[in-house]
Amino acid sequence: MLSCHELVLDSAANRVTARGQPINLRGVEYRLLEFFMSHSGRTFNRHQLLDHVWGDDSEVDERTVDVNVQRLRRILAESGHQEYIQTVRGYGYRFSAPNVARAE
């Protein structure tokens, strides 16, 4: 389980909640959020995100990362957490949330 403030990702249940309310994510959005939360504060370029989230052998282009990050931002904005995913101009993206906690 990963949490920051009131955003909780429960990997055992494949569920994300914000302020106790469920957030509906598609598979890739869930994996992207899980990866970002697991590596909070680190910056990743599109190619790295493709490798880690979609897999080394995926045949999607880097624009797919942008589309899915925007979609995830929009979903998180509905619960007041859009500021966590930051664009690092000329490089990629970073999940920047204070105190991401990991619990079993």
Regions found by a protein language model. Name each.
Residues C4, L9-S11, F95-A97:
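Conserved catalytic Walker-motif region of ABC-type ATPase nucleotide-binding domains
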Residues L2, V8, E78-G80:
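Generic detector of short alpha-helix boundary/capping microenvironments
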Residues H81-E104:
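A short linear beta-strand->loop->alpha-helix hinge motif most characteristic
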Residues V8, P22, N99-A101:
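Residues that cap or initiate secondary-structure elements
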Residues M1-S3, A103-E104:
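Basic, amphipathic DNA-recognition helix from helix-turn-helix-like DNA-binding domains
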Residues A13-R15, G20-N68, R74-E83, R89:
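Positively charged, aromatic-enriched patches within helix-turn-helix-type DNA-binding elements
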